[in-house]
C-alpha cells in the first residue's frame, strides 16, 4: 500500500485550513456566496479557493492530527470574525429597513424567503440588496474579496489567532453597523412621528372626520418616503463601509488593530 507523498499531504492540509477560514464568509456574505447560494456551491467555492491558496504557498512539512485540529479551530474562529466584518454593511442596511418597518407599523408585512427558510422585512431585504448592488457598481466588493484573499499573505493557514486585533476591529464594525442603521432609519422615525402628531391633532380638533383610520396609508407612505431619503443620504457611507471591510479583514489578519 503506497503512502501519500509528504508534499501532497502538506498541501492538502493547507488547502483544508484555508477552506475553513473562507467557509464562514461564503456562508454569510453575499460578496462571496451568501445565504441565497446553494450550500454545495458555497462549500465548493471555499474548497476551490483553499486549493488555490495551497498551490501558491511554499511546501512545508505535513502537520500531525492534533496540530491540524488546533489549526482548524483557529481558522474557524478567524473565519467567523472575517464573515462578521464583511457582512456588517449589509446587515446595517437590513437592520435599518426592519427598524423602519417596525416604526411604520409594517411588522406583519414580512416576506418568507424560501431558499434560506426565514422571514425577512420587506424594506430590510430591499435595502440589503440595494447595498450589494451599490457595492458591486462602485467596485467595493472586489476590495473585499482581495482583502480576504490577502489575509493568507499576512496570516498563513494555521497561524495563531490575532485576538486583540480581531476584538478591536469587530467592536468598531459593530458600532458602525448600529450607527448606520439608525442613520438610515431616523428619517423614517421622524416622518412617522410627525404624521402621528398631525393625526392626533386632527382627531382632537375634529374627531368626526375619522382621519386616524383614513390616513394610515398616507402615514405608511410618508415613513417609506423618509426611509428612501435616509437610504439615499447614507448610501455612500454604506459603500464606504463595504470598502473598509476589505481593509478591516487585512488588519485582523495582520494582527494590528
Predicted feature descriptions by range:
Residues 1-257:
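Hydrophobic alpha-helical segments and their helix-loop boundaries in membrane
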Amino acid at each position: 500500500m503506497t503512502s501519500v507523498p509528504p508534499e501532497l499531504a502538506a498541501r492538502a492540509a493547507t488547502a483544508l485550513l484555508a477552506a475553513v477560514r473562507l467557509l464562514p464568509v461564503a456562508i454569510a456574505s453575499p460578496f462571496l456566496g451568501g445565504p441565497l447560494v446553494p450550500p454545495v456551491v458555497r462549500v465548493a467555492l471555499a474548497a476551490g479557493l483553499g486549493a488555490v491558496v495551497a498551490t501558491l504557498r511554499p511546501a512545508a512539512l505535513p502537520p500531525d492530527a492534533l496540530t491540524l485540529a488546533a489549526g482548524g479551530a483557529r481558522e474557524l474562529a478567524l473565519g467567523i470574525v472575517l464573515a462578521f466584518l464583511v457582512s456588517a454593511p449589509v446587515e446595517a442596511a437590513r437592520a435599518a429597513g426592519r427598524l423602519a418597518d417596525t416604526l411604520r407599523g409594517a411588522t406583519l408585512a414580512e416576506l418568507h424567503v424560501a431558499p434560506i427558510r426565514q422571514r425577512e422585512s420587506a424594506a430590510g431585504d430591499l435595502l440589503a440588496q440595494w447595498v450589494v448592488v451599490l457595492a458591486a457598481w462602485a467596485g467595493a466588493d472586489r476590495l473585499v474579496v482581495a482583502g480576504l484573499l490577502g489575509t493568507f499573505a499576512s496570516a498563513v493557514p494555521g497561524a495563531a489567532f490575532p485576538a486583540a486585533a480581531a476584538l478591536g476591529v469587530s467592536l468598531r464594525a459593530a458600532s458602525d453597523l448600529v450607527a448606520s442603521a439608525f442613520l438610515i432609519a431616523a428619517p423614517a422615525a421622524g416622518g412617522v412621528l410627525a404624521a402621528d402628531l398631525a393625526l392626533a391633532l386632527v382627531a382632537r380638533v375634529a374627531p368626526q372626520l375619522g382621519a386616524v383610520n383614513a390616513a394610515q396609508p398616507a402615514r405608511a407612505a410618508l415613513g417609506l418616503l423618509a426611509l428612501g431619503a435616509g437610504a439615499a443620504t447614507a448610501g455612500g457611507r454604506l459603500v464606504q463601509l463595504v470598502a473598509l471591510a476589505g481593509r478591516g479583514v487585512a488588519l485582523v489578519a495582520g494582527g494590528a488593530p
